[in-house]
């Protein structure tokens, strides 16, 4: 468990991200893809159902022992809350109500945020725009680990700890890498979340709150679904910085596994991404892909060639306009 990862720096490149050029080529060749840039008609009802399920779970766990509460938080609540974060990811691209109803999308993301226990949705959108525009951008893409993470989490034991602590790194890293002013919507997100938490505590006590928070921290940490964090952009094969996964866990994660397709067409909802691959298979079938998120986690921990440094990084010029 003591072997150090082989890399001592990121994979620096001097080319633009591949998604921009591929998007232009595909739209020229298959203009019908534009028809997929429309709202997901089902995401509203799916999210509503998941939020209500977690509220019901708060009532059910109020009398459980702490041991069983944490078990169900990992095995059940972790799946629901992680799935909700991926719904928020999809909604951040205005897929619930369309681009003409940006405010509705923002508030619906705040609603989807409720069972997560901590205000997250608005801040996520603020930084996720940069992740797409400046993929791998030094000091801009906060999805890239810090130099400290790459240096310190370099052995199997430390990489395992890094996976457990993923929720904390994803929350705190933006404040260090690319701090931005707090927005009015972020404050409103926090106030709504606080009101929800106080209501849950008043109704069913501290165990309900612990269940929600544990569902988020455990579900976003060392959990099978969390394999997507590593699978999406960590360089398992030199020269490739984005990877897709086409397995069954897409059914509960809003097709986040179709990640190459997503970066090619961020405005297409997850529910339609399989159609992109069907329309233009020659752009995707030859690319390296993952077949198991659990195996991704295993390989990340035990392969010396993999670690937090296994990311493509580039210098990016700031764009004048905003997405």
UniProtKB/Swiss-Prot annotation:
A motif (Histidine box-1) lies at residues 89-93. One of its GO terms (molecular function) is sphingolipid C4-monooxygenase activity. It comes from the Eukaryota. It is an enzyme of class 1 (oxidoreductase). This is Sphingolipid delta(4)-desaturase/C4-monooxygenase DES2. GO terms for biological process: ceramide biosynthetic process; sphinganine metabolic process; sphingolipid biosynthetic process. Belongs to the fatty acid desaturase type 1 family. DEGS subfamily. GO terms for cellular component: endoplasmic reticulum membrane. Disulfide bonds: none annotated. A lipid is attached at residue 2 (N-myristoyl glycine). It catalyses: a dihydroceramide + 2 Fe(II)-[cytochrome b5] + O2 + 2 H(+) = a phytoceramide + 2 Fe(III)-[cytochrome b5] + H2O; an N-acylsphinganine + 2 Fe(II)-[cytochrome b5] + O2 + 2 H(+) = an N-acylsphing-4-enine + 2 Fe(III)-[cytochrome b5] + 2 H2O; N-octanoylsphinganine + 2 Fe(II)-[cytochrome b5] + O2 + 2 H(+) = N-octanoyl-4-hydroxysphinganine + 2 Fe(III)-[cytochrome b5] + H2O; an N-acylsphinganine + 2 Fe(II)-[cytochrome b5] + O2 + 2 H(+) = an N-acyl-(4R)-4-hydroxysphinganine + 2 Fe(III)-[cytochrome b5] + H2O. Keywords: Endoplasmic reticulum, Lipid biosynthesis, Lipid metabolism, Lipoprotein, Membrane, Myristate, Oxidoreductase, Transmembrane, Transmembrane helix. PANTHER family: SPHINGOLIPID DELTA 4 DESATURASE/C-4 HYDROXYLASE PROTEIN DES2, SPHINGOLIPID DELTA(4)-DESATURASE_C4-MONOOXYGENASE DES2. Its EC number is 1.14.18.5, 1.14.19.17. It comes from Rattus norvegicus. CDD domains: Delta4-sphingolipid-FADS-like. A motif (Histidine box-3) lies at residues 259-263.
């Amino acid at each position: 468990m003591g072997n150090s990862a082989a890399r001592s720096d990121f994979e620096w490149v001097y080319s633009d991200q591949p998604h921009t050029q591929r998007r232009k080529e595909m739209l020229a060749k298959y203009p019908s893809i534009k028809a997929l840039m429309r709202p997901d008609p089902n995401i509203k009802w799916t999210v509503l159902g998941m939020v209500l399920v977690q509220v019901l779970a708060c009532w059910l766990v109020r009398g459980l022992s702490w041991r069983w509460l944490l078990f169900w938080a990992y095995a059940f609540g972790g799946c629901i809350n992680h799935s909700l974060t991926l719904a928020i990811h999809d909604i951040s691209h205005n897929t619930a109500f369309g681009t003409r109803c940006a405010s509705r999308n923002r508030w619906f993301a705040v609603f989807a945020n409720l069972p997560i226990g901590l205000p997250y949705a608005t801040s996520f959108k603020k930084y996720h725009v940069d992740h797409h525009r400046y993929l791998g951008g030094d000091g801009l893409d906060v999805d890239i680990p810090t130099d400290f993470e790459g240096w310190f989490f370099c052995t199997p034991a430390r990489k395992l700890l890094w996976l457990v602590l993923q929720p904390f790194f994803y929350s705190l890293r933006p404040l260090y890498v690319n701090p931005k002013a707090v927005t009015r919507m972020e404050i409103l997100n926090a106030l709504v979340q606080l009101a929800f938490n106080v209501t849950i505590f008043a109704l069913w006590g501290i165990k309900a709150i612990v269940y929600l928070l544990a569902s988020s921290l455990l579900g976003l940490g060392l959990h099978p679904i969390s394999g997507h964090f590593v699978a999406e952009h960590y360089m398992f094969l030199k020269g490739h910085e984005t990877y897709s996964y086409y397995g069954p866990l897409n059914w509960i994660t809003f097709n986040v596994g179709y990640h190459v397709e997503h970066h090619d067409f961020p405005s297409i909802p997850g529910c339609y991404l399989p159609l992109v691959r069907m329309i233009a298979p020659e752009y995707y079938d030859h690319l390296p892909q993952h077949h198991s998120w659990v195996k991704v986690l295993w390989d990340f921990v035990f392969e010396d060639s993999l670690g937090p440094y296994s990311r493509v990084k580039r210098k990016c010029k700031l764009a004048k306009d905003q997405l």
